[in-house]
């Protein structure tokens, strides 16, 4: 297995810690006035999603996780598994509900998602940054109702609920940022 020095740590690097794949969220190099320098690292375990803070002595090495990120198109769900297809090889991969997690509300058929594979098995599914979904339920916008401009909740075709401006009506297609679950704009 390949190893990486703490001097090469950066956000997004995937490591094996306690025999589990993890990704570095933040890395801070600390050189105290007295004593040895160290790295304070915030990591997320890819299997459980837990966020931890660890410290590594400067110059230590850590094993690089053997994980692959591949782009696949979402096909369908059969109730138990979510099926994805590679557009070049037409190979299909099934991910369980644990790998998809809360991102299930952003899965739209034929959208390209990023799957993280470890030992050939999907451990995480990342939807595209923006998806276009239809509003299936929201309160009607009343003319002149401008007090509290926070918007109103709207239920989308996948079941996700986001806050939208008052002028959005049922049946409109809107663009949503999947990272923050925020309304971006109307789709024309």
Curated annotation (Swiss-Prot):
| GO annotation (BP), single | peptide biosynthetic process
Alphabetized CDD domains for the sequence:
S1_EF-P_repeat_1, S1_EF-P_repeat_2
Name the SUPFAM superfamilies for this protein.
Answer: Nucleic acid-binding proteins, Translation proteins SH3-like domain
InterPro entries found in the cross-reference section? Elong-fact-P_C (IPR015365), NA-bd_OB-fold (IPR012340), Rib_uL2_dom2 (IPR014722), Transl_elong_fac_P/YeiP (IPR020599), Transl_elong_KOW-like (IPR013185), Transl_elong_P/YeiP_cen (IPR001059), Transl_elong_P/YeiP_CS (IPR013852), Transl_elongation_fac_P (IPR011768)
Q: Tell me the superkingdom of the source.
A: Bacteria
Protein keywords = Cytoplasm, Elongation factor, Hydroxylation, Protein biosynthesis
Question: Could you tell me which pathway this protein works in?
Answer: Protein biosynthesis; polypeptide chain elongation
> Where the protein is mainly located, per its record?
cytoplasm
Where does this protein reside within or beyond the cell? Cytoplasm
Gene Ontology MF terms in the entry: translation elongation factor activity
Q: Hey, which family's this protein in?
A: Belongs to the elongation factor P family.
Question: What role does it play?
Answer: Involved in peptide bond synthesis. Alleviates ribosome stalling that occurs when 3 or more consecutive Pro residues or the sequence PPG is present in a protein, possibly by augmenting the peptidyl transferase activity of the ribosome. Modification of Lys-34 is required for alleviation.
Q: Would you tell me the protein name for this molecule? A: Elongation factor P
Origin species: Vibrio vulnificus (strain YJ016)
What gene is this protein translated from? efp
């Amino acid at each position: 297995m390949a190893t990486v020095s703490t001097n090469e740590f950066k956000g997004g690097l995937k490591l094996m810690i306690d025999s589990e794949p993890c990704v570095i969220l933040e890395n801070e190099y600390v050189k105290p006035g007295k004593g040895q320098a160290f790295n304070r690292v915030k990591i997320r375990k890819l299997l459980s999603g837990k966020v931890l803070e660890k410290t590594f002595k400067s110059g230590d090495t850590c094993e690089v996780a053997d994980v692959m990120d591949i782009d696949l198109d979402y096909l369908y769900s059969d109730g138990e598994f979510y099926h994805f297809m590679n557009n070049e090889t037409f190979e299909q991969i099934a991910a369980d509900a644990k790998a998809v997690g809360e991102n299930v509300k952003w899965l739209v058929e034929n959208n390209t998602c990023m799957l993280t594979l470890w030992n050939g098995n999907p451990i995480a599914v990342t939807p595209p940054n923006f998806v276009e979904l239809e509003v299936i339920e929201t309160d009607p916008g009343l003319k002149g109702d401008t007090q509290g401009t926070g918007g109103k909740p709207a239920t989308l075709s996948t079941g996700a609920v986001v806050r939208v401006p008052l002028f959005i009506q049922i049946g409109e297609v809107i663009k949503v940022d999947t990272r923050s679950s925020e309304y971006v704009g109307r789709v024309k």
